[in-house]
């Protein structure tokens, strides 16, 4: 239990630390950020195309998720 707690604190500290760095450096990496968002958007489009091909596999679990959420 102690090991899990320490690793959790480490992860928490790291995430806060990295957020702080991103926040302070956001002005200099704003262009890079926009590129990343654009690439992620294009990636999402590509995944959507694949998704339509795999819908027959994914659909059942997706429907179950929707019904779980509404209850």
UniProtKB/Swiss-Prot annotation:
<feature type="signal peptide">
    <location>
        <begin position="1"/>
        <end position="20"/>
    </location>
</feature>
<dbReference type="GO" id="GO:0007268">
    <property type="term" value="P:chemical synaptic transmission"/>
</dbReference>
<dbReference type="GO" id="GO:0030354">
    <property type="term" value="F:melanin-concentrating hormone activity"/>
</dbReference>
<dbReference type="GO" id="GO:0031777">
    <property type="term" value="F:type 1 melanin-concentrating hormone receptor binding"/>
</dbReference>
<keyword id="KW-0964">Secreted</keyword>
<protein>
    <recommendedName>
        <fullName>Pro-MCH</fullName>
    </recommendedName>
</protein>
<dbReference type="InterPro" id="IPR005456">
    <property type="entry name" value="Prepro-melanin_conc_hormone"/>
</dbReference>
<comment type="similarity">
    <text>Belongs to the melanin-concentrating hormone family.</text>
</comment>
<keyword id="KW-0732">Signal</keyword>
<dbReference type="GO" id="GO:0045202">
    <property type="term" value="C:synapse"/>
</dbReference>
<dbReference type="GO" id="GO:0005576">
    <property type="term" value="C:extracellular region"/>
</dbReference>
